[in-house]
Swiss-Prot record:
GO MF terms held by the record: ATP binding; microtubule binding; microtubule motor activity
Coiled-coil region list: 386-471, 626-688, 732-942
GO BP term, example: microtubule-based movement
Protein name: Kinesin-like protein KIN-7L, chloroplastic
Subcellular location, record wording: Plastid, Chloroplast
Organism lineage string: Eukaryota, Viridiplantae, Streptophyta, Embryophyta, Tracheophyta
Encoding gene, per UniProt annotation: KIN7L
GO terms for cellular component: chloroplast; microtubule
Length: 977
């Protein structure tokens, strides 16, 4: 699907994001969806990555099913009612759409919704099962299809009174998270549009003309931005922000018509909490909610940009119809997915292993009967597409280890059951005296022994796999891998600041199974394991919404989100004084790791082997002590991070007010605190080193290597964090230097202005200055100072007023453009009305001429009947009857002509009234344009006057400066005399 958007960063078993793009915890990479794969029990799990593991066809949830197709009728619009539109299509029951004019034309669908159906009912039938499947790991796609102004955007987005499919789906997703305590979820969203065959990112205005890429896993958009979401309100705010960048325009059918296809993708990642029956598999799915642009009818008289947009929309929708026709035709060898970007992104949905729901919105009006029929035929073809839903599961090395451990427990339980089943068999053997029964019991006993041996061998083989998989990731933890990993939105360095991040994940796996020196597996105390699991929090557990405290849930989530934002961004400034502390911590961390390794090597060189075997109690005690030291070190690190953030704020305040001594004192105190924290961290490191050296005799060699490798990993992570902070400190130092230089420049400029002001104050009256030079130098003229200050204030006011006038001028220009467009539209309507009026006048003239001819014929007939002699009429009675019948027919035709003439005159009067109304509206628009032009000219004159006044004041200032020069020369001459 289109949301498999990746910027091709692949780091090992599953694709993992290592950088955060912005402080909003957004990402520009996305994951690949892998189907559940079976792993051979004879292969080592350490060598099985997602691509190297054998890929089998996904196990379907059920048999093949068809695309869910529903039809929704919208009510007649007021415009259609005014025009007298009739119902051409209607819902015949809950599943059939029938034509009003031809009852034999009917189509059957999964559900048909009438005009009075609410969007909530549509969601319950057409979308809810797709959303539930997506939360369970099955890909889902819901899209609305129909002609323009048929109600697609209303169905998908809705309004405050009637929410659409997208808000309802988001709300249901978070409700499912709240109702699923055994799994933890991570949700990411992306939102983009296809406008004129160009993919634009709606969440990132800079992401324009993005490219569609393909690899072995499918189609994705390169560089698309994803946002990690924490609540329904967060998702809806992102949708609202994206809608502001969507292309919308007015057409003859709709004032606000969508001019692009939009696709909202919700990526759902979930993992189990604690033990589960699936071996710790991670579900990764995508829910795509698509709002297609409406197809443009040939009746729409568009031009320019609207015509171009309509051609691109029709092309993509025509390609979509062709693709659906090919998919329903089993003889088709080629499906043209690549003919448009819409079908290219929908390829995995229409031909993959996910659920698809199509909502067709139609209008029952007779004027759109043909377009409605085409939409119904499209929906009927889509109904025959077969799909097969399947869960997307990802199993990494840790999940495989948990799966093997679960299998070992099951096999041991089976072994215990077999042992319990053998005892009654031996008792029956002693009791029975029949030889046949003895033979049968012996055979059964041999079979049980063989099964027991097979189970023991399988347990040993799985134990070896666990040992290998536990050791191998430690050695390759810092090495680069080329295989793709499952994508996470939070890296290890980002999760370090989350409130429940623990480092006992590997300890829990190591405690799960203890293997003695003889190779016999021993399970550690279950009570201790349960205690460890209750203290452990999942990487995604912080995202869950608690039922009891729903009112505080949003605030807590937002606080956690802000914590992630402030700590995960690589470019977060930390202040100027912590750079040397960062470098010292780096050196101390690397030195501590090297010292531990050297100590181990020296001790291993002198000792050949350990004489004591480690017990589970000793291991538990050592792990607890190490965990306490690590928690102390983690607490100090968090306190130091908080102090670094405080240092950042103080640095910003110092940049704004460099003369504030209190801020400088606080910065110095913070530097001292940070240095003290560094010393405490170094002390803890030494304590950990002493603890490792003291407990070296009690630990096994493999455990020491593992502990040191874990400590080295932690130190390397801390070093990486400190490197990031050092870079941030350098950046903030440069910013602070720039601010300081800028403040110095401002101070110099203020000094120059003060000097000019003092010179202007000394000017005043030349005669008084020459007579009282010493007195004027000691006490400056306050009145002149007030005048200059008033002039400066007036200049500032004039500048502000000029800026306001310029903004008002721009607004008036925009308004003039809109009025000009409306005027052109009114002119077009007036011209069309004039053409129609001309045609009507010609028709009226023709009817009048015809009426005159008929009147002349009638007069001639009447005259001939009057002048006819009585004798002749008496002899031709039959002819008289015929003439009377003809006369009646002529009178009837005359009455019909009179009625037609009356109707035509009434139509002429109505058209004349409409024309007069159009002319009046055009005159009003022209008057409005003239008034706006006059106001624009007036504002331009005012602006010119303002600029002239500013120039005049500047010239006065220059004259005052020249006068000050002359006064200074006079002063020199006066002192010389």
């Amino acid at each position: 699907m289109g949301s498999k958007q990746v910027s091709k960063t692949r780091n090992g078993g599953f694709s993992k994001l290592k950088t955060v793009e912005s402080s909003a915890s957004s990402t520009t990479s996305s994951s690949k969806l892998y189907q559940e794969a079976s792993v051979d029990s004879h292969s080592s799990p350490t060598s099985s990555s997602v691509r190297s593991k054998p890929q089998l066809p996904p196990k379907p949830l059920q048999s093949k099913e068809n695309v869910t197709v529903t039809v929704r009728f919208r009510p007649l619009s007021p415009r259609e009612i005014r025009k007298g539109e009739e119902i051409a299509w209607y819902a015949d029951g809950e599943t059939i759409v029938r034509n009003e004019n031809n009852q034999s034309i009917a189509y059957a669908y999964d559900r048909v919704f009438g005009p009075t159906t609410t969007t909530r009912n549509v969601y319950d039938v057409a979308a809810q099962h797709v959303v539930n499947g997506a939360m369970a790991g099955v890909n889902g796609t819901i899209f609305a299809y129909g002609v323009t102004s048929s109600g697609k955007t209303h169905t998908m987005h809705g309004n405050q009174r009637s929410p659409g499919i997208i808000p309802l789906a988001v709300k249901d997703a978070f409700s499912i998270i709240q109702e699923t305590p055994r799994r933890e979820f991570l949700l990411r969203v992306s939102y983009f549009e296809i406008y004129n065959e160009v993919v634009n990112d709606l969440l990132n205005p800079a992401g324009q003309n993005l490219r569609i890429r393909e690899d072995e896993q499918g189609t994705y958009i390169e560089g698309i931005k994803e946002e990690v979401v924490l609540s329904p309100a967060h998702v809806l705010s992102l949708i609202a922000a994206g809608e502001e960048h969507r292309h919308i325009g007015s057409t003859s059918f709709n004032l606000l018509s969508s001019r692009s296809h939009t696709m909202f993708t919700l990526t759902i990642e979930s993992s189990p909490l604690g033990d589960n029956n699936e071996g710790g598999a991670v579900h990764l799915s995508q829910l795509n909610l698509i709002d297609l642009a409406g197809s443009e009818s040939s009746k729409a008289e568009t031009s320019g940009l609207r015509r171009k947009e309509g051609s691109y929309i029709n092309k993509s929708l025509l390609t979509l119809g062709t693709v659906i026709s090919k998919l329903t035709d089993r003889r088709a060898s080629h499906v043209p997915y690549r003919d448009s970007k819409l079908t290219r992104l929908l390829e995995s949905s229409l031909s993959g292993h996910g659920r698809v729901s199509l909502i067709c919105t139609v209008t029952p009006a007779s004027s759109n009967s043909e377009e409605t029929h085409n939409t119904l035929k499209f929906a009927h073809r889509a109904k025959h597409i077969e799909i097969q839903a399947a869960q997307n599961k990802i199993i990494d090395e840790k999940s495989l280890i948990k799966k093997y451990q679960y299998e070992i427990r099951q096999l041991k339980e089976e072994l215990e059951q077999l042992k319990q089943g053998i005892k009654p068999v031996s008792q029956l053997k002693d009791i029975s005296g029949d030889d046949i029964d003895i033979v049968l019991l012996k055979q059964k006993l041999e079979e049980e022994e063989d099964a027991k041996a097979a189970l023991l061998s399988r347990i040993q083989r799985l134990t070896k796999l666990i040992l290998v998989s536990n050791k191998t990731p430690q050695t390759s933890r810092f090495s680069y891998r080329a295989d793709p990993r499952r994508r996470h939105s939070f890296g290890e360095e980002e999760l370090a600041y989350l409130p429940h991040k623990r480092r006992d994940l590997t300890d829990d796996e190591n405690l799960e199974l203890y293997v003695s020196r003889e190779g016999t597996p021993e399970i550690i105390d279950d009570a201790f394991i349960e205690e460890k699991k209750t203290r452990k929090h999942g990487l995604l557990n912080w995202l869950k919404i608690k039922k009891k405290d729903s009112s505080l849930g949003g605030s807590s989530l937002s606080d956690k989100s802000s914590a992630v934002k402030s700590n995960s961004t690589p470019s977060t400034p930390q202040g100027e004084g912590s750079d040397f502390h960062t470098e010292s911590r780096l050196s101390e961390g690397s030195a501590l790791a090297d010292q531990i390794i050297e100590t181990m090597e020296n001790r291993e060189a002198h000792e050949d082997s350990f004489h004591e075997i480690e017990t589970p109690e000793t291991r538990i005690k050592m792990i607890d002590q190490m965990e306490i030291l690590r928690e102390q070190q983690k607490t100090l690190s968090e306190e130091m991070a908080q102090q670094s953030r405080s240092f950042k704020l103080l640095s910003e305040e110092a940049a704004k007010a460099p003369q504030n001594e209190e801020i400088k004192a606080e910065i110095i105190n913070l530097n001292g605190d940070i240095k003290a924290k560094n010393d405490q961290i170094a002390t803890l490191g030494k304590q950990i080193l002493d603890f490792v050296i003291a407990s070296h005799d009690e630990l096994d060699k493999s455990d020491i290597v593992q502990a040191v490798s874990e400590m080295r990993a932690q130190l390397n992570e801390k070093c990486f964090e400190l490197e990031v902070k050092a870079a941030d400190n350098r950046i903030i130092q440069e910013q602070l230097t720039e601010k300081t230089s800028f403040c110095e420049d401002l101070q110099e400029e203020v000094a120059n202005l003060k000097q000019q002001l003092s010179d202007a104050l000394e000017l005043g009256d030349i005669n008084s200055v020459t007579c009282h030079m010493q007195q004027s130098s000691q006490s400056p003229n306050k009145n002149e100072e007030k005048v200059i200050e008033a002039q400066a204030f007036e200049i500032e006011e004039l500048k502000l007023k000029a800026a306001e006038l310029s903004e008002l001028n721009e607004q008036l220009e925009i308004r003039n453009k809109k009025l000009a467009e409306e005027s052109s539209y009114a002119k077009e309507l007036a011209s069309a009305a004039a053409i129609e009026l001309k045609a009507l006048s010609e028709e009226i003239a023709r009817l009048m001429n015809h009426n005159e001819r008929l009147a002349a014929d009638l007069a001639a007939v009447q005259k001939s009947s009057v002048t006819t002699p009585q004798g002749k009429t008496g002899n031709l009675r039959n002819g008289r009857r015929e003439s009377v019948s003809k006369r009646k027919e002529q009178e009837n035709s005359l009455m019909e002509l009179k009625r037609e003439l009356t109707v035509s005159k009434e139509r002429e009067v109505s058209f004349e009234a409409a024309l007069i109304e159009k002319i009046q509206r055009e005159a009003e628009l022209q008057r409005t344009v003239e008034e706006s032009k006059q106001r624009e000219a007036y504002l331009e004159n005012e602006l010119a006057n303002m600029w002239g006044l500013v120039a005049k004041l500047r010239s006065q200032g220059a004259a005052n400066s020249g006068l000050s020069d002359s006064v200074s020369e006079t002063r020199i001459e006066h002192f010389g005399t």
